[in-house]
């Protein structure tokens, strides 16, 4: 099966839900007209990143009764969408979230599990951490979603791999850091190495949508990528600018790669479980 994925590497307007929604809908229509199957937006694509105490005022509920998601669900009749937003639960806790929409239905929501609160980042002051990492079924196969810092920890992609995810969708709002006279930012080079490593180690497709533009002194570098199950780069978006970058992947490559390199077949989660119990409980 072939799957045409588009990475919506956008610049968002901080706190402006309507302007960001309009951009989502316009890109969804453009991607649909081009025959795209799945359009992947970055982290907090509907709100902007440096929200701090703005978070409650831009939160949404991923359901048809929400005015923002009503329009996004309608747009998902033509192609599947992964969008970034602030989710509010029934106890009024706020989460950095991504939603997967398909054929007018909500398929899955992921709440960011790891909230960086160091250096440039202050997420733990304003958001609650998610408490689950689960793969989900789509019309194209079994996928997993992660958000930025989740991918810097080995456990979430590993759990999704064990849970059956054959395509890892990764959304981020990653600012540029570390020029040091090199041709690439240190941060972008590190992210690309990590994405390539996960694709090869887990013999999965890894699609990463990173935002671009400036916000509150941060420069988001873009450079969105797709890697195949051999760890080879399929496509990369430009650095530091908005783009809609599209590639067609062949899901049959999973069969070819895993037949040649049966890492999933030989994985021993029961060993991991036993050793984790020893480490955690003595």
Identify the residue ranges that each predicted region occupies.
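Extreme N-terminal starter segment of soluble prokaryotic enzymes
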Residues: 1-7
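Short polar catalytic/cofactor-binding loops
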Residues: 9-15
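Cys-nucleophile CN-hydrolase/nitrilase-fold catalytic domain and related Cys-dependent amidase chemistry
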Residues: 17, 26-112, 174-197, 201-204
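Short amphipathic alpha-helices and their capping/turn segments at secondary-structure boundaries
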Residues: 22-36, 155-164
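Active-site catalytic loop in hydrolytic enzyme cores
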Residues: 62-67, 89-193, 259-263
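CN hydrolase (nitrilase-like) catalytic-core segments centered on the catalytic cysteine
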Residues: 64-82, 148-244
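Short beta-strand scaffold segments in enzyme catalytic cores
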Residues: 83-85, 96-100, 134, 224-226, ...
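A short C-terminal boundary segment appended to hydrolase-like catalytic domains
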Residues: 255-282
